[in-house]
Amino acid sequence: MEAANEPVNGGSVQIRTENNERRKLPNFLQSVNMKYVKLGYHYLITHLFKLCLVPLMAVLVTEISRLTTDDLYQIWLHLQYNLVAFIFLSALAIFGSTVYIMSRPRSVYLVDYSCYLPPESLQVKYQKFMDHSKLIEDFNESSLEFQRKILERSGLGEETYLPEALHCIPPRPTMMAAREESEQVMFGALDKLFENTKINPRDIGVLVVNCSLFNPTPSLSAMIVNKYKLRGNVKSFNLGGMGCSAGVISIDLAKDMLQVHRNTYAVVVSTENITQNWYFGNKKAMLIPNCLFRVGGSAILLSNKGKDRRRSKYKLVHTVRTHKGAVEKAFNCVYQEQDDNGKTGVSLSKDLMAIAGEALKANITTLGPLVLPISEQILFFMTLVTKKLFNSKLKPYIPDFKLAFDHFCIHAGGRAVIDELEKNLQLSQTHVEASRMTLHRFGNTSSSSIWYELAYIEAKGRMKKGNRVWQIAFGSGFKCNSAVWVALNNVKPSVSSPWEHCIDRYPVKLDF
């Protein structure tokens, strides 16, 4: 595989191949697999009964409001002579109401969240990165030049963070150092979350932690249970090896748990560990994560309690998960392995961008019927049917997702995918600003990047009541996952936001 001059991303990491066309993200809106359209409409029809009840209830309320006192008296007299029918209908109404209330999905609210801000002492500038890489003496001249070019074109700024163990010469990627990094990130985010929300940790009923490349024993979730003395019956989950899309997977899992367990809180912690996952070899396909991945993590508090609606920031509307792991190329395109010298790292396939495009296409095709206005759906469906039935060369209609969402949080895994999504979804620079600035300020923080992006939008004062947010992330496996939120209020940034002391400097102009 040839050295990269320009990074592109898929599943959190970037690479350039010899073939420029294969490197680019395919225009996934130009070809649509019908099974994903059907899946999206299946989700829509699942809620069709509830949608039909809305106009029926409106008509019923209107008619009742027109009744006079004489009308009500006549109805009462009629019921007196039909007591059996009255009792039967009353019982039926009570039974139907009970079944509806018991079976309807519980609302899931995002009370608050926090993103970890590392100390300034852990910041790494380009020159410091290159100087340390030379001093380590594990990299040859070709590898050093390759990393320099990746850094210059990556979209990362001069204020990203690396763990303390990698600031040492030589680095000390020990188990103890890796544990220390995870504790600093997770506990730092959780301390802020509990302080801001005034939640007692023992009130947490569900805990979900995701970290792709570091899975010690006891687990990261067990470390949190031990640190905050969570109650003995907490439902604890630890997700590993699921890549940069695992943050949305964790939200989806927590949502499902909150459907089962009433009146409880769920905490989701999304992080990655850099200390033990630095590559010290010379295989270019495995060097790119060194240039992109940086320290970061987030903690999110979810609730299914009705009383929490007033103080919550968002309500979860949809989660859509797409997995292409059944395809061998997709399964192998981001693969942790050892090189010829026994050095461990993440290897990237030259087909990675094409696979990312297929996963994205499948995901948004399923999501579309759930979120797009009916006018967009009709236009999209008509052009699709015309093309399928008449084998027409008619150019497919590209739905305008800007009509469905006010804000976009695209996983900040790399500059190239942000560029391609901006182009294919016809987004403005403002729509992708949060993703670009998060990549510049914090680098690729893996599954937590979408939360730094949401914090950026809030810090800019752009999140208004009723605004809809689309979080989209993708990662190894190969997976593409989406979460849709609606703002319940004009959202203000949380106390100790990661952008608190630098938001006035952004957006910055990026020159490549």
Curated annotation (Swiss-Prot):
Any one cellular-component term (Gene Ontology): endoplasmic reticulum membrane
FAE domain boundaries: 100-389
Bilayer topology annotation: Multi-pass membrane protein
Catalytically driven reaction(s): a very-long-chain acyl-CoA + malonyl-CoA + H(+) = a very-long-chain 3-oxoacyl-CoA + CO2 + CoA
Induction annotation: Repressed by herbicides such as flufenacet and benfuresate. Down-regulated by darkness and low temperature, and up-regulated by drought and osmotic stress.
Top-level taxonomic group: Eukaryota
EC number: 2.3.1.199
Function: Involved in the elongation of C22 to C24 fatty acids, which are precursors for the biosynthesis of cuticular waxes, aliphatic suberins, and membrane lipids, including sphingolipids and phospholipids.
Protein name as catalogued: 3-ketoacyl-CoA synthase 9
Gene: KCS9
